């Protein structure tokens, strides 16, 4: 169900600024970054059918860390109704610790804001699954975006992609209506980013050692 204007107004008054926060690993892999970019545009476009100025946050910083960067990220996460996580093994890897912190923070916010609901505020989209998944991810029904890797950028022009974007937006709308029912407040002044990532149980794939001279000498 689209977010009615009255609900949109109440959520804005409660301190919510973004309809969703896109969480992804900043990597040279174009499947990951391209998916995040396309989702930002597609979600915003779909929401624009019922909302005058939909807002979707995606961090485009090339340099991570620092108090100012962390504050911007924290405020954007806190003032978002939902989080769309672009998942692949690299997203769970300890090298991208902030992905796990973003997940843990939004999970904590949802627990506080959506008491008694059988869903949270995180919407995982999976471009490559890992086996096993971290427990925090395995507990949530994810949306399969693996065709991004086999079809390439042309996938973003397919009916299948459009259907999945609509499914994401429907979940965002469901979360928005629930937040309104619970009279949730953003209450960002008291938000602390968790110290522990949500993916402590993740087992990264073993990485082969780089070839040394002895491997190819005859």
What label would you give each PLM region?
Residues 33-37, 70, 96, 100-103, ...:
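Generic preference for well-ordered alpha-helical elements
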């Amino acid at each position: 169900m689209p977010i009615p204007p009255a609900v949109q107004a109440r959520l804005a008054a409660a301190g919510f600024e973004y309809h969703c926060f896109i969480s992804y690993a900043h990597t040279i892999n174009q499947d990951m970054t391209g998916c995040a970019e396309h989702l930002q545009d597609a979600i915003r476009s779909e929401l624009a059918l019922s909302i005058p100025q939909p807002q979707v946050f995606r961090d485009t910083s090339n340099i991570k860390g620092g108090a100012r960067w962390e504050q911007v990220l924290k405020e954007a996460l806190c003032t978002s109704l939902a989080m769309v996580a672009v998942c692949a093994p690299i997203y769970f890897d300890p090298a991208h610790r902030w992905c796990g912190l973003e997940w843990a923070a939004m999970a904590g916010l949802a627990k506080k804001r959506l008491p008694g609901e059988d869903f949270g505020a995180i919407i995982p989209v999976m471009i490559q699954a890992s086996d096993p998944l971290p427990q925090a991810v395995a507990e949530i029904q994810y949306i399969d975006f693996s065709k991004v890797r086999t079809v390439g950028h042309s996938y973003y022009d397919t009916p299948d992609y459009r259907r999945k974007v609509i499914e994401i937006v429907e979940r965002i709308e469901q979360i928005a209506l629930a937040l309104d029912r619970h009279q949730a407040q953003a209450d960002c002044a008291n938000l602390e980013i968790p110290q522990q990532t949500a993916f402590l149980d993740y087992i990264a794939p073993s990485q082969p050692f780089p070839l040394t001279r002895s491997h190819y000498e005859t």
